[in-house]
Amino acid sequence: MLKIDKLLSAPHGIAPVLVRRAPKLVLPFAERSKSRLRAVLDNGDEAALFLARGTVLRGGDLLVAEDGSFVEVQAAAEAVLEVRAEDPHALMRAAYHLGNRHTPVEIGRDYLRLEYDAVLADMLQRLGVRAERAELPFEPEAGAYGGGHKHGHDATFAEDYAAAQAVFHEHHGHSHSHSHDHVHDEKCGHKH
């Protein structure tokens, strides 16, 4: 079994001839979002992935096995909804409502693409856009701060929170201290 623990994200600068010769790992988005995975390559070899937590593989990425060999990642065709509209406003409105539902979305120049969901297809059609089922590769946007969507205080919460705060402070122009310049005792007038 091929053990893989390194990722070279596209564009990686590896010679095209080496990429063409590499076996392919063809997976749908849900499988490309796992950091620990056993899979079969297109040449029949088995592979075990041990990647950093939160890693999302994209089509065109290269994996490096312990023996130094390369494996190219390809996004598998899967059931998706392809959303199109007659005008950009309608498409933006659809994107807004999908975002409100925390739905992973691939954003193209004139389309949105999401994992197939009959309920969302109905909602989108009620919004006045075309939502057609198709079998296509799915490459949704990464989270706003580089990771996936998180709820609660999981293993990467502190990192995600720090990244969000850094972006806020860059935009906001200054930081706020939470220290106090007085003694905390029963006479300070507030509870701690």
UniProtKB/Swiss-Prot annotation:
Cellular component aspect of the GO annotation: cytoplasm
UniProt keyword Chaperone present: yes
Gene that this polypeptide is encoded by: ureE
Role this protein plays: Involved in urease metallocenter assembly. Binds nickel. Probably functions as a nickel donor during metallocenter assembly.
Compartment(s): Cytoplasm
The protein's name: Urease accessory protein UreE
Highest taxon of source: Bacteria
Pfam family, one: UreE_C
HAMAP family associated with the record: UreE
Family: Belongs to the UreE family.
